[in-house]
Amino acid sequence: INEKIIEMNSARTLLSIKQLEIVYPSQNGHGYNTAVNGLNLDLAQGEIGCLLGSSGCGKSTVLRAICGFEPAHTGEILLRDKVVSSASVHIPPNQRRVGMVFQDFALFPHLTVLENIAFGLQDLPSDKRTASAQHWLDRVSLSDKADAYPHELSGGQQQRVALARAM
């Protein structure tokens, strides 16, 4: 029975993108530039996917849209079978339960390492937020840096903080 439960859970669609289009106003103020056009994607729980393409083709834009930082012009994005982005729906990033490690790490310079990791856990009580952040700080072997600020860390350490925050 346990194998069947695992099999059913792993086949569950975690992310579904249907005919996604994302556009930006053109720099000259006339018309729009299409960043993503007609993207379809289904990713099951436990499955690993990869976006490949040349520089500027829209990979980061798609990831930002999944996280909620970019709106869908047309099409829709579903997380766990719930529409989180479409022309008429936009669930804010903090309500999507999606983490992302940015190319530049995007750490808040005025927050300590522990505060950076806890930032996305605002819906938890303070003690649970701190405990969860400390758990992930331990997992990335930076528990001794909890009170440090991002500028006091190496690039590799900053990346591990960003990874802990995404988790």
Residue ranges of model-derived segments:
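Short, Lys/Arg-enriched N-terminal segments with co-localized hydrophobic residues
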Residues: I1-E7
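ABC family nucleotide-binding domain
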Residues: S10-M167
